[in-house]
Each structure stands twice: as structure tokens, then as C-alpha cells.
């Protein structure tokens, strides 16, 4: 997906200014063969095959429609706001950061122990960072898979309501929750990337950060759901994340830390062979 708005000959270097002519060229009949060829080539690379076969032909068609609808959707947003362009700031941007844990007794200096903090290293990629006006930076996450209604609710008014958003993060960090709103956690981490990473802060430049998921169903239903996380919710989520990480790394102070009771999540765990769950 990133190459749609990348400079020619690059994979991730953002093109910058995107206007109507740029989008219409990529939606044109003349561009269709190049779009089709590019998608097939990327699928072949992903599945390590020389050609697209069987169900992957269907996948190719779905992705092609998704790419075209993404371009149409961006044009619709631009026109609905009376703009002649928007700016792509970053594509598949890696913004690693360190998250500070709670204070604990550190080295002894004189007669007192100097408090220290455990550092947790995070690494992640933001699919797309763009801006439709001077006061806002938008995080866009591409979702070609299914997005449930429960997850989608964090993209609506709940995301802009402090009390509702706070309740969502109670669910994010609840033990053995099958209704965990993963999208809320994902955008919270993106927010930390843009706050705690120097390059991320520079990209934002003091502007308001909003979030939006480009899901297949959402795009074709024309559901425009852009939201921001209130600072109070970010602070609460940060404390919850800190408590969770501290508990993992300090078992003596957190005797309730245990293996999950929901074995479905074990399917995606890199440590399941060690755990033996």
C-alpha cells in the first residue's frame, strides 16, 4: 500500500503534496495495468511464488479494489473539506521509543538510594502519517482483514468522549478479555511513538494527532471515523501499561501475574513453546 503515495523508484519515501490530478492519474484506465502488475508482484514476493494462483487471484482482486477505494476515499475527504491537496508526511515509519516504568530503589549514593526507572523498548511502524490542514496530523492504519463492530466503536464518538474512551482502555488491559479492543491499544502505542520518539515529535510539530482505520468494509460503506485520544485517557492508559509491564518484570511484587486462561491468544505468541500452555 505504501508505494501508492511514495516517490517514483522508492518504496517508502513520501511524495509529499497530493492533489486531485495525482489521485485521478492513479485511478485512470491507463494506470490500471501498472496497478494490477504491482499488486501481483508484491503478492508473489509475499507468498514466495513466481505467479499468483488459486485463492491468491481473489486476494489480488480484493487488494486492487481496496487500493482504488483508498484513493477515491482520500479524494472525497479532500473535496469535502474544500481543499486542493493534502500532504503525506511518512509511510511505514519506524519510530522506536523507550517507555519508562515505575521508580524503584536504584544505586546507593551517600546515605540514600537514588530512585531509578526500568526502561521498556518499543518498536513499531505507522502505515501512514498525513495532514489535511495545518493544525492536525492524522495516523492512518490500513486493515485488509476483518474489523469487528466492537473494535470499530473506538473509531467513532467513543474515541472523542473521555469517559467512554477511558472505559475502552479498562477493557484493553482487562485480564483474559475476549472483547479486547485491539485498535484502541494500537493507536495508543502510535501516540507514544509520536510523543516519545524525537523524529515523531518533529513530524507532529505540536499539531493535534487524530487516528483513522482504513478497513475494507469501512471504506466501501463510506464510514469516515477520525478520532483523537483525550490527554486524560492517554495518561490513564500510560499508567495501565506501566503497571502491566512492571508486573511482568517484577514477579515478586506481582504474584497474580500468570499464564492466560484464553488459549486462543497462544496461537500468536512467540513464547508458547517455553510456556507450555
Task: State each model region's role.
Residues 1-277:
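RecB-family 4Fe-4S metal-dependent nuclease core
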Amino acid at each position: 500500500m505504501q508505494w501508492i503515495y511514495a516517490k517514483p523508484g522508492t518504496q517508502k519515501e513520501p511524495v509529499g503534496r497530493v492533489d486531485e490530478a495525482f489521485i485521478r492519474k492513479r485511478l485512470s484506465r491507463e494506470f490500471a495495468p501498472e496497478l494490477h502488475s504491482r499488486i501481483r508482484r508484491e503478492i508473489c514476493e509475499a507468498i514466495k511464488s513466481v505467479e499468483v494462483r488459486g485463492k491468491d487471484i481473489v486476494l489480488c482482486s480484493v487488494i486492487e479494489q481496496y487500493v482504488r477505494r483508498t484513493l477515491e476515499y482520500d479524494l472525497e475527504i479532500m473535496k469535502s473539506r474544500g481543499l486542493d491537496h493534502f500532504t503525506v508526511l511518512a509511510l511505514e515509519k519506524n519510530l522506536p521509543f523507550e517507555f519508562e516504568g515505575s521508580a524503584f530503589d536504584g544505586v546507593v549514593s551517600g546515605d540514600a538510594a537514588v530512585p531509578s526507572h526500568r526502561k521498556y523498548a518499543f518498536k513499531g511502524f505507522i502505515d501512514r502519517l498525513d495532514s489535511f490542514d495545518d493544525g492536525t496530523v492524522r495516523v492512518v492504519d490500513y486493515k485488509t482483514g476483518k474489523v469487528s463492530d466492537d473494535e470499530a466503536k473506538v473509531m467513532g464518538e467513543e474515541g472523542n468522549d473521555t469517559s467512554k474512551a477511558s472505559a475502552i482502555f479498562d477493557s484493553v488491559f482487562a485480564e483474559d478479555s475476549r472483547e479486547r479492543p485491539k485498535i484502541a491499544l494500537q493507536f495508543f502505542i502510535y501516540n507514544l511513538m509520536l510523543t516519545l520518539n524525537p523524529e515523531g515529535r518533529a513530524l507532529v510539530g505540536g499539531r493535534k494527532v487524530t487516528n483513522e482505520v482504513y478497513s475494507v468494509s469501512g471504506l466501501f460503506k463510506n464510514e469516515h471515523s477520525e478520532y483523537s485520544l483525550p490527554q486524560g485517557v492517554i495518561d490513564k492508559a500510560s499508567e495501565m501499561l506501566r503497571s502491566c509491564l512492571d508486573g511482568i518484570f517484577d514477579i515478586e511484587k506481582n504474584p497474580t501475574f500468570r499464564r492466560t486462561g484464553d488459549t486462543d491468544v497462544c496461537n500468536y505468541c512467540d513464547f508458547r513453546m517455553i510456556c507450555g500452555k
